[in-house]
From Swiss-Prot:
Protein name: Alanine--tRNA ligase
Pfam families: DHHA1, tRNA-synt_2c, tRNA_SAD
GO CC terms in record: cytoplasm
Function: Catalyzes the attachment of alanine to tRNA(Ala) in a two-step reaction: alanine is first activated by ATP to form Ala-AMP and then transferred to the acceptor end of tRNA(Ala). Also edits incorrectly charged Ser-tRNA(Ala) and Gly-tRNA(Ala) via its editing domain.
UniProt-listed InterPro entries: aa-tRNA-synth_II/BPL/LPL, Ala-tRNA-lgiase_IIc, Ala-tRNA-ligase_IIc_anticod-bd, Ala-tRNA-synth_IIc_core, Ala-tRNA-synth_IIc_N, Ala-tRNA_lgiase_arc, Ala-tRNA_ligase, DHHA1_dom
Entry note about domains: Consists of three domains; the N-terminal catalytic domain, the editing domain and the C-terminal C-Ala domain. The editing domain removes incorrectly charged amino acids, while the C-Ala domain, along with tRNA(Ala), serves as a bridge to cooperatively bring together the editing and aminoacylation centers thus stimulating deacylation of misacylated tRNAs.
Major localization listed first in the record, in broad terms: cytoplasm
Key words of the record: Aminoacyl-tRNA synthetase, ATP-binding, Cytoplasm, Ligase, Metal-binding, Nucleotide-binding, Protein biosynthesis, RNA-binding, tRNA-binding, Zinc
Length: 923
């Protein structure tokens, strides 16, 4: 369908011919009329290894600067890189390509680009080939996608296919590439809801760039089929290119692997720590690595069978056995993977990702734990942060990482401790699960291994080893980590908000919202535009519709002498809908009526104070805990509010106190709160992506709010000065999930009431204990110590009482076929006392003890000695039936059971029934 898209004058004007590759079937363009294959692996092997394709070797910084300078000279504006965590997106967690920086707002035409045309070197993270990293010689988790982009509209074309190809060809020529060796392979591209013609740029068997001409959008009614999906033409059309920085460096050096090309000093350091002699000047060793990378380029090695086939082919080509080759390659591949993964973590944590069990944090923890496992296997005993420091030393162009290193180090140390605890706990958990499958004779399914990793952090290698020790078979795919990473890389699709009366709302103009310009005004006049059921739409309103964690305004609407109570305010597609308390027989309001609205001022101001306090607390938390703090959720109420932030450990009381003091300092400074509607691109360039702490708002214009040092995109209502917030009191902190801390607080009058409640609690406690408030802590501590001593004494007395009872109970035992049965009701005994007594009674193996008591309900404890169990006694079954007779439940093992209920009237019958059941079991 896209064949016409490739009829480009650049090719015909520069001596290219179009051919079809006999191996893959794709069409490609080449200046070499003798060439038959497309130049891409596996159709062509890596010929650049040991034979660099450019005129000189370039290191990463040099190649990056060469590229960016080249495009600046060609009229492009260089822009700064975006973070690897896609803060401006709610559909992906990680930045996976340079074009992701400009989706969805720029690519859709809603927002102008930061420059046009532009050039960038964007660090990206893709974990879909995680298991191939190290093994293939070419795969990376983190890479820089150098790019030049042009955003064309129907009114203005910057440049399109012709100039894009000219620029690419010119860049390669300036690097010293042989024009006859470069091929352009046709390969339609699709992704992120867009598609277009694309050419892959190849040299020496290596793809070094991709040139996408994005001019299609996904459309089920479209007429263009690409990879099974239908597309239609876009009004705008975009040049989306990607040049692999690391691949270009590798091609310039011709190193055996990409890892030796891009971080050789770190590879060598790690090889030394692992006790591996990594001497690339050794021709035999270098030949093994080179041959492995060459042949790996010819196949997908994510599958175990393909990896084994690769081993066989490489071994045969160099004259050694596959086992010998594996013994050489596996440790080296692990070192390569560690070097790659730690660079990935440098960007992940350096850009603010906090390891956790959800979203981007899950992916960071996945990489951390895979790295730690490989380090352990190789005997590399240094902290992972030391390797991160090596990378930071090699990345002076990213000074932000060095500034954040103390936090990066603290996070990683915390993760290492957690992983050690997980392994200890996980082995026991896995053994239990494996025994279950062994008893049932089943093979352990992959779903169980994934659940053990997802829910409990147990690495699949540990699960497989433990299961194997127990004698349970496990099929573990070689691409396990890639599968898990893919599963967690896409954000959950948001449920679309159901719009009631959508047909009526669609015909209405957007409501003018007055509360932004006049935040202190509470009365307004308006015209009724529509009435349906108990919902009213006005031409303008001062009532704030629910959003951004702020509840809806309430108030009244008055028409003539009738006052209608507004109990909810919502907004749908810019139309604000006011909900009246109830549907009356006849709603006293009609379309076209003039109404007087009044906002419930007390509720509004309570919400505004708490919303402004949320911004103040967020900023204070960042100052106390570190720049990695990121808002993950917030909710405001009239009497309190809460803020959820990403943080890798519990907030201490001292830290909470500091946050509270700093927040109140901001209040006392009485700073003016500044709000402004700004162009999205301008706001992002000025303030960065911290704008989107509270979420990513749609549209070209966004409302930017500055509260003290906190600057965010926010559409809520606020105080006009920080002083109007009043006192802020942090009520508590708690960990709501791994990696997320919640602060709960109150502001203004609500804070005063909260503090008064605390004072009342302290005063009442002091009066109860008859001490002053200052003496409360020491008095409570003394009482607690005394309570512990009394508890010890009580336990001792219970043991003595149980011991003294035992002899009497043994004397009263009934003999049934050589088994001595003791059934007894013991008044006012708790479960602990019953258990101790029953335990002593059954120290003799032919004794069965069933004891019952009434204390906070009915308690039942039964035990049986070994001989009794061998004779068929099962006290678990007996206690189960007894418990139903006293209005409860219970059960247990044949030798030990507990139960109880709420109906003491059934105790005698239950005890009698226990004797009958015992005799049945023994006969």
């Amino acid at each position: 369908m896209l064949e016409d898209e490739y009829q480009i004058d650049f090719f015909s004007d520069n001596g290219f011919v179009r051919k079809q590759c006999p191996t893959c079937g794709n069409f490609f363009w080449t200046r070499d009329i003798e060439r038959s294959t497309c130049g891409d692996a596996p159709c062509d092997p890596y010929s650049f290894i040991g034979n660099p394709v450019f005129k000189k070797e370039l290191e990463l910084p040099d190649m990056r600067e060469f590229y960016l300078n080249f495009f600046e000279e060609q009229g492009h504006t260089r822009i700064e890189r975006y973070p690897v965590i896609a803060r401006w997106r709610d559909d992906i967690y990680l930045t996976i390509a340079s074009i992701a920086d400009f989706q969805p707002f720029v690519t859709s035409g809603q927002v102008p680009p930061p420059a046009n045309p532009l050039t960038i070197s964007q660090p990206c993270i893709r974990l879909s080939d995680l298991d191939a990293v190290g093994k293939s010689g070419r795969h990376l988790t983190t890479f820089e996608m150098m790019a030049h982009h042009a955003f064309n509209t129907k009114n203005e074309e910057i440049y399109w296919k012709e100039h894009t190809l000219e620029l690419c060809d010119g860049l390669l020529n300036s690097l010293g590439a042989d024009p006859m060796a470069v091929t352009y392979k046709e390969e339609p591209w699709a992704g992120g809801g867009n598609a277009g013609a694309c050419v892959e740029v190849l040299i020496g068997g290596l793809e070094v760039a991709t040139l996408v001409f994005m001019n299609l959008k996904k459309d089920k009614n479209g007429d263009i089929d690409i990879k099974g999906d239908m597309y239609s033409k876009m009004e705008n059309y975009i040049v989306d290119t990607g040049y692999g920085l690391e691949r270009l460096v590798w091609a310039s050096k011709g190193s055996p692997t990409i890892y030796d090309a891009i971080f050789p000093s770190i590879v060598n350091e790690l090889m030394g720590l692992a006790g591996i002699e990594h001497e690339l000047e050794n021709n035999e060793y270098s030949h093994i690595l080179s041959q492995n990378a060459r042949l790996a380029g010819l196949m997908d090695i994510s599958e175990k069978a393909n990896l084994l086939e690769l081993r066989k082919q490489v071994a045969a080509s160099i004259g050694i056995t596959a086992d010998k080759l594996s013994s050489i390659m596996e440790p080296v591949e692990n070192v390569y993977a560690i070097a790659d993964h730690t660079r990935c973590l440098t960007f992940m944590i350096g850009d603010g990702i906090i390891p956790s069990n959800v979203k981007a944090g899950y992916l960071a923890r996945l990489v951390i734990r895979r790295t730690l496992r490989m380090m352990k296997d190789l005997g590399i005993m240094i902290p992972i942060s030391e390797i991160i420091q090596m990378h930071i030393n090699n990345l002076p162009e990213y000074p932000e990482f060095q500034k954040r290193f103390d936090v990066i180090k603290d996070i990683l140390e915390h993760e290492e401790r957690k992983f050690a605890e997980t392994l200890e706990r996980g082995r026991r958990m896995m053994e239990k699960s494996a025994r279950h499958y062994k008893e049932s004779g089943e093979k352990m399914p992959l779903e169980t291994i994934i659940d053990m990793y997802d829910s409990h952090g147990i690495p699949p290698e540990i699960s497989k080893a433990v299961a194997s020790d127990v004698g349970v078979e496990v099929d573990l795919p070689d691409n396990f980590y890639s599968l898990v990473a893919d599963k967690h890389s896409q954000s959950e699709e948001k449920e679309e908000k159901v719009v009631p009366f959508a047909d009526k709302i669609a015909r209405l103009p957007k409501t003018k919202r007055l509360f932004y310009d006049e935040p202190n005004r509470m009365d307004f006049d308006a015209v009724v535009l529509e009435v349906f059921d108990n919902h009213i739409v006005l031409d303008n309103t001062l009532m704030y519709p629910e959003g951004g964690g702020q509840p809806a305004d309430h108030g009244t609407l008055t028409v003539e002498d009738v006052v209608l109570k507004v109990v909810d305010t919502q907004m749908y597609d810019g139309v604000v809908v006011h909900t009246i308390n109830e549907i009356e027989d006849e709603l006293h309001i009609r379309k076209g009526d003039m109404v007087v609205g009044r906002v419930n001022e007390k509720r509004r101001m309570a919400h505004a104070r708490h919303h402004t306090a949320t911004h103040i607390i967020n900023d204070a938390a960042r100052e106390v805990l570190g720049s990695h703090i990121w808002q993950t959720g917030a909710q405001k109420f009239a009497d309190r509010a809460r803020l959820d932030i990403s943080h890798y450990k519990r907030i201490t009381q001292e830290e909470a106190n500091q946050i509270e003091i700093i927040a109140n300092h901001t209040v006392m400074k009485n700073k003016r709160i500044i709000s402004d509607w700004m162009d999205r691109t301008e706001a992002e360039q000025k303030y960065g992506f911290r704008l989107y702490q509270g979420g990513v708002p749609p549209g070209k214009m966004i409302r930017v709010l500055q509260v003290g040092n906190d600057i965010e995109a926010c559409a809520g209502t606020h105080c006009t000065n920080t002083g109007l917030v009043g006192p802020i009191k942090i009520l508590k902190t708690e960990r709501i999930q791994d990696g997320v801390e919640r602060l709960e607080y109150a502001a203004g009058e609500a804070a005063i009431i909260a503090m008064q409640d605390i004072e009342t609690l302290v005063r009442d406690s002091s009066e109860t204990l008859r001490v002053s408030a200052e003496q409360l802590p020491s008095t409570i501590e003394r009482f607690f110590d005394e309570w512990k001593e009394l508890k010890k004494e009580n336990n001792k007395l219970k043991e003595e009482l149980a011991h003294s009872r035992v002899s009497q109970l043994v004397n009263d035992a009934e003999d049934v076929n050589g088994i001595r049965i003791i059934t007894k009701a013991i008044p006012h005994a708790d479960s602990e006392e019953l258990t101790k007594t029953a335990g002593e009674l059954t120290q003799e193996s032919n004794v069965v003890a069933i004891l019952i008591s009434e204390m906070d309900g009915v308690k039942i404890v039964a035990t049986a000695g070994d001989d009794a169990v061998k004779r068929g006694v099962n006290v678990g079954a007996i206690v189960k039936e007894m418990s139903t007779m006293v209005g409860g439940g219970g059960g247990g093992r044949p030798n030990m059971a507990r139960g109880g209920g709420t109906d003491p009237s059934g105790m005698d019958n239950a005890l009698s029934r226990s004797v009958e059941l015992l005799k049945e079991q023994l006969n």
